[in-house]
Amino acid sequence: MDIIVLLQQAVLNHASDIFVVAGLPVSYRANGRICREKEEKLMPPQTKECVEELYKLAGGRDIRVLEEKGDDDFSFAVPGLSRFRVSAYKQRGALSAVIRVITFELPEPNEIGIPDPVMSFYNLSKGLVLVTGPAGSGKSTTLACLVDKINHSMEKHIITLEDPIEYLHRHDKSIVSQREINVDTESYVNALRASLRQSPDVILLGEMRDYETIDVAMTAAETGHLVFSTLHTIGAANTVDRIIDVFPANQQRQIAVQLSMVLQAVISQQLVPTVDGKQVPVFEVMTITPAIRNMIRDNKVPQIDGIVYSSNKEEMHSMDFGLLNLYKDGRITAETALSYASNPEMLKKKL
C-alpha cells in the first residue's frame, strides 16, 4: 500500500478522515458519511506497514510509544499536499490508524459558515472564551480562525498549547509560539503554568481536561490574558455546569464566583447535513451579560439557556435560531433541524 497515494486520494475527495483498520478496506469520511474503497480487506501486516510509514512521514517518530501504550497521537505535513493528524492505536492486536486531513491554508471564516459575532471575539483583551461541541464539529478550525485574525491584525504574543498541533500559524503582526504536548512540553497544565512566565497576551488551550488545567486557565484569564479553549459540551448552561462540577464540592462556590468574573463567551457548534449532501456548521452564541454573571455566581445556571433562547439576535442566539435560519434558507430539512435542536418542541412550532 502506497501511503502517499492514500493521502492524495483523501485530499482529492475532500475527505475529513481516513480509516486504516484491519478487516476492512481503506475507508474515508467525507461530508459526514463513511465510504469504503472497493479493494480487498486490509490484513494486520498491511495495516502495520501503513502505520509504520506514517511514523516515518512524521520525521521518524518512535513507534515504541504506540507499541507500549496501545495508542499515540501525532501530526505531520506532506509538502504540496496537506497536513495530517494521526491517532494510531491497537485493536484486536493489530495496528490501526485514523488520519485527519488538515488543509495548509485556513479557510475564510465566512466561506465555512463561521458568523461575524463569533469572529468578533478576537477583539477581546482578556477573559475566557470557550468553543464547545462534539468531536469533529470544527472547534479547532473556529479557534484557528480566531488566532489567525489576531495574528494578522494585532501586535500580540499568542501561545498555543495543542495535542497535536493542527494548523500552522506563520508570524505576522503577532508572535505565535505553538507548543505540542509530549513533544515540546510534558502536559497541558505544565505548559499553561509556564506560559504565564512567557509574556503572553493570548493563550489557546487545546482542551481543558481536568480541574487543575481549568483552574490555571481561569487564573490566566483573571490576571489579564485572553484565553481560548474547548470542551465537549453543547449549550452554555451545560458548559458552565461541566466546569463547576469538575471541582470538589467544597470549591464549587468559589469556582462559580471566579468563573462569573472571567467568562466572556461560550460558542457551541455542531455540523449538520445539508440537502445537497454536504455539511454546514450551526452555532449557539452566548455573550456574557450582568444578568448571566449573576446567574453563574448565584447558582442559577439552568436559567442561562432561557436568556440565550429569548435573545435570538446575531450577537447572542440559540442553536435553534441558527437551525431555523438554515431551514428558511433551504439548506437543511425540517427533520434535520429538529434532530439537532436543543428544544425540538419549541422549534417545531416555528418551522
Walk through the language-model features, giving the residues of each:
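Short, flexible helix-loop junctions that flank or precede catalytic/ligand sites
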Residues: M1-L351
